[in-house]
Amino acid sequence: MLKLMNLSTYSYDLERFDFDSQKITDFLEKHYMNGVELLNPIMWEEKILPKKIVKGVHLKYYPTWLDFWNGNRRSLLKQFKSMDAVEKYYEGISRDIMIQHYRKEIETATKIGAEYMVFHVAHVEVEDTYDYKFAYSDAEVVEAGIDLINQVFSGIDTNIKLLFENMWWPGFTMLDKNIAFKLLNRVEYPNKGFMLDTAHLMNTNLYLKDEKEAVEYIINRVEEFGELKNLIKGIHLNCSLSGEYVRSQIKKKNEESEEFDLNPMSEEVFMHVFKIDSHKPFTDNSARKLIEFIKPEYLIYELVASSTGELEEYIETQDRACNFYDI
C-alpha cells in the first residue's frame, strides 16, 4: 500500500514549500509518505515535482457541466446569468473544450508515469447544493459521463488505471451497484476501477453522529457493493460530519421566498460546499478498521489546511487515528 497526500500545481499549494522540490520531498519523507496525488497536472514542472513522487493524478472536476455538455442554453443562462460567465467558467463555449482539457491532463499523467487517474462522475447545480432538489438523476448524469469519458479516451495511448471517485451529488455515489456496473461495462477503456472517498460517502447520510458510526456506515455500503469491492483500488481518507449543517441549509432554503441568484463562481458557494466537505482528518481509531477492510493499493490523505503547520497537524492526527505504522 502506498501512502500519499493530495497536492496541486496551484501557487497556494507550492508556495508553502517555496516551489522547492527538496522541501516537498523532505516533507513527504518526514511523514512517511510515498508520494502525491496531483491536481491540475497540466501545469506540472518536473523541477518542482519529480516524476518519482507523482503516483496519481486527479483529473479536473466540473461540478456543474451537464447543461453545457448538452448545449442547454436556457438552463445555462438561468444559472450563470450571461454567456460570458459561461465562457469564463468553462474556458470556452464548445463541449470540445472539456474533451481537450481532459486529454491534455491524461497525456501529462502518462508523461509523468502516474499509476492512476481519478475522475468524478457527478453533476450538481448551485441552487441544488442548498435545497438538495436535484435537477438530474444519477442515471442521467452517468449516461452523459460515459459519453464524455469515451470521447476523451478515444485514440489515447495510455494504460493508467482510471478510478471513478464517488460523490454525494447525482452521478456515481457508490450507493447503487447498477450504476457502478454501468460505468464498468460501458466506459470503453479497459483499465478501470474505483476510488472510495470516505467523506463523500459520509455526506450521503445527513444523520451520522460520530466517526465510529460513520466508519460502520461506510463499511456497510461497501459490503453492499459485493464483488465490486475488489475494484476499489484507493481511498481518499478524510472526514465529514456535516449533516446538521446541510439539514439547516435545506430548511432555510425551503423557507425562503426570494429568487436564488448565486452563480457557480461565487465565493459564498465555494465556502458553502467547503462546509459540507471540509477535508478534515479522522481522529477516531475506527479509521484503521476501514483501511484493513478495504485493503487499498493507495491510501491518500486528502486534507485541506491553511498552512504547512496545520497540514502537519492534520497528517499526524490521522496517522494516530489509523495507527498507520502497525498496519
List each model region and its residues.
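Short, solvent-exposed beta-strand-terminating loops
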Residues: 51-74, 122, 237-257
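Histidine-acidic metal/acid-base catalytic patches
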Residues: 2, 99, 113-115, 189-196, ...
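Hydrophobic faces of well-ordered beta-strands that scaffold small-molecule active sites
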Residues: 2-10, 34-38, 53-59, 117-119, ...
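Well-ordered, non-membrane alpha-helical segments in soluble/globular domains
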Residues: 17-26, 76-77, 92-105, 138-151, ...
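Active-site acidic/histidine proton-transfer and metal-coordination neighborhood
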Residues: 91-193
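Acidic-and-aromatic substrate-binding clefts and catalytic sites of carbohydrate-active enzymes
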Residues: 13-20, 33-48, 63-67, 96, ...
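Non-catalytic positions within long, well-ordered alpha-helices that form the structural scaffold/packing
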Residues: 28-29, 110, 185, 292
